[in-house]
């Protein structure tokens, strides 16, 4: 039984049978709610009224239920040939159902390429089961993914919240404290980096609906539920999450990622992709790649996936080299303050007449050159985002 694909064998304390009987799973990282998704494969289950159902769920009475996809914590089913259903064995959030139940979100995003839920079942406030109109799994292109994610996030931009770097950095610390990597990384983030409501799309969850491609929105991972807060993340964070899945699961190369990025960039606010917003010394894309790999590391521990764990560990070792480079840049940045201090010394030396006017001007000019040169070199050597 513990061989179920959704079972967190790497951190589970209670047994699968105990967890399904009680609806609570005890893990090394804390307790979570869970349920036996297999019961909804029986047609009799659909005939029973359900307390925490919403939308059309209680109206459904399928005669045929077929599993289309098992993907870790997610199970995709086809109900007759009329609907599809997505079940989470461990419900992790209500972000997907909120797209239907929150009227301003629904009206804001209705013109995008999202596939909206039309019914569902909640467990302790999170999405256990979601119903969607009938659709068929399909493949798509980096152009479509970049444009679709960009359009979604651009619609959410007016609802953005201010830079929340303190909690974003705490999010990293929480993962580091539990996973004990040999890396520690924090970022100041540009002021233009803001939080938005989370809409997560995945390249394996793209559907064809009567000839139109749609992205089925997914909830957060189990490790994020257990180890991270609920704060909003920047649009760049979800872009990097999707980038990670394109590389990890679709084998995208750097040219395809560049195409994906350009189509996303064209559709989001320009300030999100400004030089400072993408600057590695301020966090930029690389800090969110670091976050994404920490989550991958956590998921590999959670599911006991050794190959994925080794891949994450290899990437984290490369972070040390990047951090060493950033350390050198911080030394160059200190030259700005050396230059400013030199100019201050020149001014007071002139005031106190300990240096002649010409010598003071020369010293001040040298300080200015040191400051400007250090700043220019600092930004010139900033590692590129791509």
Task: List the predicted regions and their residue ranges.
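Juxtamembrane C-terminal module of membrane proteins
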Residues: 312, 377-386
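Alpha-helical transmembrane segments
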Residues: 346-348, 368-381
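Active-site activation/catalytic loop segments of kinase-like enzymes and analogous catalytic loops
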Residues: 228-272, 290-308
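All-alpha amphipathic helical-bundle segments outside canonical DNA-binding/catalytic cores
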Residues: 273-291
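Cytosolic-side membrane-insertion boundary helix
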Residues: 314-341
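Hydrophobic alpha-helical transmembrane segments
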Residues: 349-368
